[in-house]
């Protein structure tokens, strides 16, 4: 138990502040549950209402109540660390690529193999392969079922584009087109409005996508190397640098946040994940907002988007249960319902998120009347990469955000040499972190 506690303390201290799941409310206790009640923890308040509705539908047939509690991202992991050290854990909860490798290695999660083998509702071949692989240990043991998947799109403010005479983004946009549009808006407003904003600590919905568009990888498919320091990686990061020169300074982003800047009409464009749609759909000025495909990198120089030039990151949360839950059968039954075709379709229909099961997300595009969210679905007709991870993802992710990583070019984007040097440093940071795992 001391070994587990030490591992999880190190993990929590290293955790990134980036979460795949937007706003959250603080608070929410958890308990070990009882034979007729399950406690569920998540970190995204945007999803609570829809997921509780699905859980209530399960409760009507199971006779077991299930209460969803929202815990903010930081406290979420502190809570689970305490549970792993001998305290109480929620019965059912979300897992994430940042942390799940250590959870699986330390017997904190309920092993699901026997349940899956006897469950006609679950066939792992029906889910996105990257998500299944994430929650399957190297010995074949499965510790979570795919809850959802997400993609990234470009969000823009039509009113600001109109005000500054800039044409709306289209599927033909390159990253250079985005740069020129952002530059026009920033300069046209004398800096009162930023053409774009990127939170550089939010890698999944931001700069990771450009690295892949230009032909490099943050982590390779074998999870044992990177090409961030290659010519292709440097080209992608050079484009990131250019965008930052016409966007909101990172000091402003750190203070206000890209979402708040956008909702207050202080920036005209951001890139954002599908898990955040509802926050913008319910915002005061949502009629001004529209989504578009992420731009592409015209690496081949032929004026069209070729294979490998437009990527979207995708990730997927997993539904897991505590190995110490007092009612493992009910916990799995609930997870199975969430992840069954019925539950996955309900999740899409209610606009919670797109499904972790393939072929169930079309209804998601119709869940937001008056707002076209089809770019998130359309992104899958191009290229996807699974959110990069290794056994100790947060070690190198954290280091990339520090001095010696990308901190200097983030803060001083006008200096191209700083970015090139940071890419070389990043290559070493990731390689050394993997070697130490």
Identify the role of each PLM range.
Residues 4-6, 17-108, 117-124, 168, ...:
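Conserved N-terminal structural module of periplasmic/extracytoplasmic solute-binding proteins
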Residues 56, 60-61, 164, 242-248, ...:
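Extracytoplasmic/periplasmic substrate-recognition and gating elements
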Residues 77-89, 160-161, 179-184, 256-270, ...:
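Short helices/loops that flank or line small-molecule/ion binding pockets
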Residues 82-83, 90-91, 121-160, 303-312, ...:
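A structural signal for short loop-to-beta-strand junctions that line the ligand-binding cleft
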Residues 91-94, 268-272, 290:
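Paired acidic/hydrophobic, glycine-rich loop segments that form the ligand-binding mouth/hinge
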Residues 97-151, 290-293, 368-369:
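Hinge/lid segment of periplasmic solute-binding proteins
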Residues 181-184, 222-252:
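Glycine-centered hinge/linker elements that transmit conformational signals in sensory
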Residues 304-305, 349-405, 437:
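Long, aromatic- and glycine/proline-rich binding clefts that accommodate carbohydrate-like moieties
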């Amino acid at each position: 138990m001391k070994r587990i506690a030490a591992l999880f303390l190190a993990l929590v201290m290293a955790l990134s502040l980036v979460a795949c799941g937007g706003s959250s409310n603080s608070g929410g206790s958890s308990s070990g549950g009882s034979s007729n009640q399950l406690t569920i923890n998540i970190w995204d308040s945007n999803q609570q209402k829809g997921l509780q509705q699905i859980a209530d539908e399960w409760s009507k047939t199971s006779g077991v109540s299930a209460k969803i509690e929202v815990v903010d991202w930081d406290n979420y992991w502190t809570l689970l660390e305490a549970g792993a050290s001998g305290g109480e854990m929620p019965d059912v909860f979300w897992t994430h690529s940042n942390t799940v490798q250590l959870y699986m290695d330390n017997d904190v999660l309920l092993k699901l193999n026997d349940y899956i083998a006897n469950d006609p509702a679950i066939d792992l071949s029906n889910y996105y392969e990257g998500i299944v692989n994430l929650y399957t240990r190297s010995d074949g043991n499965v510790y979570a079922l795919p809850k959802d998947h997400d993609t990234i799109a470009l969000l823009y403010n039509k009113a600001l584009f109109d005000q500054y005479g800039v044409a709306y983004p289209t599927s033909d946009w390159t990253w250079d087109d985005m740069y020129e549009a952002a530059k026009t808006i920033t300069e046209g407003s004398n800096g009162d409005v930023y053409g774009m904003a990127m939170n550089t600590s939010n890698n999944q919905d931001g700069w990771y996508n450009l690295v892949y568009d230009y032909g490099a990888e943050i982590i390779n498919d074998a999870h044992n190397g990177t090409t961030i320091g290659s010519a292709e990686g440097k080209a992608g990061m050079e484009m990131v640098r250019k965008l930052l020169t016409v966007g909101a300074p990172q000091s402003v982003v750190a203070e206000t946040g890209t979402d708040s800047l956008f909702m207050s009409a202080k920036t005209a464009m951001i890139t954002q994940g599908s898990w955040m749609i509802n926050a913008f759909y319910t915002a005061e000025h949502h009629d001004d907002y529209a989504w578009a495909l992420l731009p592409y990198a015209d690496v081949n120089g032929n004026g069209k988007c070729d294979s490998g030039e437009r990527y979207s990151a995708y990730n997927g949360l997993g539904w897991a249960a505590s190995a110490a839950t007092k009612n493992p059968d009910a916990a799995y039954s609930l997870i199975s319902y969430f992840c069954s075709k019925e539950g996955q379709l309900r999740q899409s229909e209610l606009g919670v998120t797109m499904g972790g099961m393939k072929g169930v997300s079309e209804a998601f595009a119709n869940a937001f009347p008056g707002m076209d969210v089809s770019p998130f679905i359309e992104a899958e007709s191009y290229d996807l990469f699974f959110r990069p991870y290794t056994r100790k993802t947060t070690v190198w992710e954290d280091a990339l955000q520090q001095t010696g990583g990308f901190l200097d070019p983030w803060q001083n984007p006008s200096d191209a040499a700083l970015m090139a040097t940071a890419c070389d440093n990043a290559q070493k940071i990731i390689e050394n972190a993997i070697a130490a795992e």
